[in-house]
Design a protein with these regions (language model features):
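Rhodanese-like catalytic fold shared by cysteine-dependent sulfurtransferases
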Residues: 1-17, 21-127
Length: 127
């Protein structure tokens, strides 16, 4: 698990890949302000939990496809990865897949946007 302070440090130093597991619209802030403020935690990337599932078969995509999605987002097996979403549910899906792919230093920010967006002192990006 990761908390607000770890996420804040991670987005400031850039050594940790922080992944938003919400939809692209929610990541960009165009899907409404479900958590108080629209957008995402600053300096984070988007790997939506729903995109890990093949829409035709309704099962997880192949390991190679999943690995490519996370690698293209900047996840590195040698570094810490923190997943977040609205309240930890979608992020748990991303963390589960990362673990299956061999990532060993994975955490979920369980308070996620429910906490972050409610604190106007914490940085967010839109668009």
């Amino acid at each position: 698990m990761a908390d607000r302070l770890e996420v804040l440090a991670a987005i400031e130093d850039g050594s940790t890949c922080v992944i938003n597991a919400l939809s692209k619209d929610q990541h960009l802030g165009t899907g409404g302000a479900n958590y108080g403020r629209p957008g995402r935690i600053s300096n984070t990337v988007n790997v939506p939990a729903g995109d890990l599932i093949d829409p035709e078969t309704h099962v997880y995509r192949s390991p190679d496809q999943l690995a490519d999605r996370f690698a293209n987002a900047g996840a590195d097996k040698e570094s810490r990865v923190i997943a977040y979403c609205g309240g930890g549910i979608a992020a748990s899906n991303d963390a589960f897949i990362l673990t299956l792919l061999g990532y060993e230093n994975v955490a979920v920010y369980d308070a996620s946007m429910s906490e972050w967006a409610g604190d106007p002192s914490l940085p967010m990006q839109f668009g």
